[in-house]
Structure formats: C-alpha cells, structure tokens
C-alpha cells in the first residue's frame, strides 16, 4: 500500500500542539540574557507546567533546606537550562506517550526511548566538551517523531505471520509505504521549521554514514539510540534487528567501555524524569 508524503504529513498534523505557555517560555529562554522572572510569569498561568517546575525544584535531587512554594522561586532554583529541558520533555511526552500497537509499543514506551536517546546523545557531547549539546539533545528527543503518523497505517497492514522475524519495522515501512519514519520525521521537522542539523539527525539516525553534514550529531544520536535498544527501552519486537554502525563509534572516538557508563547515566536520569513527568506520560 503506497501512500503519498502529503497523506502522511496530514496524519502528522493530528499531533497535539505545544501548549502556548511552553512555546512562550521556550522563546524567552532562547535569549541568553533572559529575565527568568518573565519565564516564571508565563509558566504560572499553566497549572500543569507550574506543578512540574515546583515538583522538580522541591525534589531530593536539588536538596534544598526549605520548601519552594512559588513558580518564581522554582525557576530561579532550576535555571534556564533545566527549565528548558523540562518544558521540551513535557511537551514531547504528550506526543510520544500514547500506546503504539502498530509498533508493538505500550503507552509511555516510545517517550521513554526518546528521552533516553536525548540524554545519551547529550552525554556523549558533554563528555567530549563539544559544542551543540542542546541541539543534539533535541535531535534525540525528536528522532522518532515520524513513527506517530506511520503507526495508524501499520495497524492497517496485513502482515504475514512470521514476516517480522526476518526484518525490522524500518524495512517494513519502506516496503509498504516507500518511505521510513526517519525520513518522514525529517519532513515533519521541515514543516515545523526546525534547524537543519536537527532535520539531518532525524533523517539519518539509523544510517549515520549517509548524513551529508552534521555527522557527529547524527552519530551521537545513532549510538544513543542503539544504547536504548540494548537496554530494551522503548523497542518493539524488532529491537535486535538494528545494527550499530562501527564508523559512528570511530567518528565519536567512542570506546566500548563507555557504553556501560552511558547506560548507567541515562538509567538514572530516566528514573528522575519518570518521577516528575508521570502525569504527562500516561501509562507509566
């Protein structure tokens, strides 16, 4: 069953919009000289976002001696980077938290996977002290956004018994629809006016050798994605069908021993995120 790109994009158009408060706050945070009081004022009008920043600021992770009771206090404690990450993670949770039976994924699985890829890719960049840690985080968070419009179509495909035993969902997407979720996700990114480096990382995170530019970012997302698959985080029945690109490891100068460290770091961070975003990711 071949479908047009426009049909798939229309399906993507059904995704819920980003809350206005989150949009405005993220816009403010892009300014390096942002007044966090303005950010607090924007977040204070959104009950869910307010509760998230207060919950994180009062967590044992920050270990404050007294209780944070206002959104203004919370954003001052957290800082712009933590607030930004929380807003993006919360928003994407709304997209990726639903069950995706077409991919054999329960509720929350794809979201957990996306968060792990984002954190893992950023950890790789931070450890190497490379610029672009924010961008690689966003690329990891959005790398599988193309699965959402595909999922409904996959449910309608009559797959012969045992067909999944010999291939991946990626291969099945190409076979049945002529495009895969990575390329569709990149097209969604273009429609959302994402930066070129994010679009490239989304498009090539399964085949990093094909990336025409931003190769280190693509490689970091690819390796972090592979780490999540090794952990069994947010993968379907085809989880072992994907091959880790050794050239990507070489490009990153990534030692095998680092994989264990990456997995350990990401496991702790996912657990922390679960504590504060559970009401945004049903099914956890």
Locate the predicted segments by residue.
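Conserved alpha-helical "signature site"
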Residues: 1-158, 162, 167-243, 280-284
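Terminal helices and disordered tails flanking the catalytic cores of nucleotide-processing hydrolases
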Residues: 1-7, 246-284
């Amino acid at each position: 069953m071949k479908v047009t790109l426009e049909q798939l994009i229309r399906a993507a158009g059904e995704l819920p919009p980003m809350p206005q408060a989150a949009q405005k706050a993220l816009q403010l945070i892009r300014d390096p000289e942002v007044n966090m009081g303005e950010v607090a004022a924007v977040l204070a009008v959104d009950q869910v976002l307010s509760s998230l920043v207060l919950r994180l600021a009062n967590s044992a992770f920050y270990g404050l001696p007294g209780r944070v009771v206002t959104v203004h206090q919370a954003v001052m404690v957290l800082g712009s980077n933590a607030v930004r990450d929380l807003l993006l993670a919360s928003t994407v949770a709304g997209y990726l938290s639903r069950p995706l039976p077409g991919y054999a994924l329960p509720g929350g699985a794809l979201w957990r996977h996306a968060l792990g890829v984002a954190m893992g890719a950023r950890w790789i960049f931070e450890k190497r002290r490379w610029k672009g840690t924010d961008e690689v985080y966003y690329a990891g968070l959005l790398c599988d956004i193309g699965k959402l419009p595909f999922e409904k179509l996959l449910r309608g495909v009559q797959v012969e018994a045992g067909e999944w035993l010999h291939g991946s969902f990626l291969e099945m997407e190409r076979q049945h629809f002529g495009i895969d979720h990575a390329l569709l996700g990149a097209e969604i990114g273009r429609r959302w006016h994402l930066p070129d480096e994010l679009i490239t990382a989304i498009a090539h995170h399964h085949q990093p050798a094909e990336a025409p530019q931003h190769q280190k970012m693509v490689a970091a997302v690819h390796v972090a994605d592979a780490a999540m698959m090794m952990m069994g985080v947010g993968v379907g029945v085809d989880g072992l069908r994907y091959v880790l690109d050794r050239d990507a490891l070489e490009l990153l100068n990534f030692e095998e021993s680092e994989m264990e460290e990456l997995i350990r770091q990401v496991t702790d961070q996912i657990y922390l995120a679960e504590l504060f975003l559970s009401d945004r990711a049903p099914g956890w």
